[in-house]
């Protein structure tokens, strides 16, 4: 049994053209994880007849447990990257909750902690978020509700992400992050590395 399990984990699932370090500045590994999460969850929802645009994906850097090697990526990487049983959830944030989220991200980024982020570019200056921060291509509209993709752990205030407590319309899924990563690799030969900035520190 151990030999057969080892053989499965040693299978090559994709090719990575670059090394992606889990602690790299601007977090390309986190950006990759956020982007695939948005795509996989939107597909999951569509299969259930739900058309929901996800504006932002936010996870925690502490949940990303290893780096991605350049070259062949083995199935074991999925379990090393994501050993937790985290499930995706969607929550709507607006106004002050969005500002609190930006401030949290800016403070952590200023000390070199870049949380996996998709759908936005956080601009920080002097340890605080700047109004140049954009969601999509647009600056924050405090009257608008934004749909944020995260995990059940963070929704409950994990990693001190307490701003999620001010969210509304929470939508739970039964899709685990690890399952989404596996599905991504099932239809991906060569990994696409995100090149757009998720953080800009001034």
Task: Explain the meaning of each model-derived region.
Residues 4, 11-12, 190:
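Coil residues (strongly favoring Ser/Thr
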Residues 1-5, 41-44:
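Charged, low-complexity, helix-prone segments enriched in Lys/Glu/Asp/Gln
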Residues 31-34, 38-202:
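Feature captures C-terminal
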Residues 8-24, 80-82, 161-165:
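Acidic/histidine-rich, surface-exposed loop or edge segments in extracytoplasmic proteins
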């Amino acid at each position: 049994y151990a030999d057969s399990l080892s053989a499965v984990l040693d299978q090559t699932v994709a090719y990575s053209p670059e090394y992606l370090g889990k602690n790299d500045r601007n977090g390309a590994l986190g950006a990759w994880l956020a982007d695939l999460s948005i795509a996989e969850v939107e597909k999951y929802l569509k299969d259930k007849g739900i058309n929901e645009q996800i504006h932002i994906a936010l996870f925690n850097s502490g949940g990303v447990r290893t780096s991605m090697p350049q070259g062949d990526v083995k199935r074991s990487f999925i379990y090393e990257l994501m050993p937790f049983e985290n499930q995706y959830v969607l929550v709507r944030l607006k106004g002050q909750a969005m500002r609190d989220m930006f401030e949290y991200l800016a403070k952590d980024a200023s000390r070199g902690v870049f949380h996996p982020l998709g759908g936005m570019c956080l601009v920080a200056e002097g340890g605080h978020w700047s109004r140049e921060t954009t969601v999509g291509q647009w600056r924050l509209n405090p009257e608008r509700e934004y749909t944020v993709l995260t995990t059940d752990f963070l929704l409950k205030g994990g990693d001190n992400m307490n701003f999620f407590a001010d969210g509304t319309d929470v939508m739970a899924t039964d899709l685990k992050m690890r399952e989404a990563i596996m599905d991504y690799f099932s239809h991906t030969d060569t990994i696409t590395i995100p090149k757009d900035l998720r953080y800009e520190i001034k």
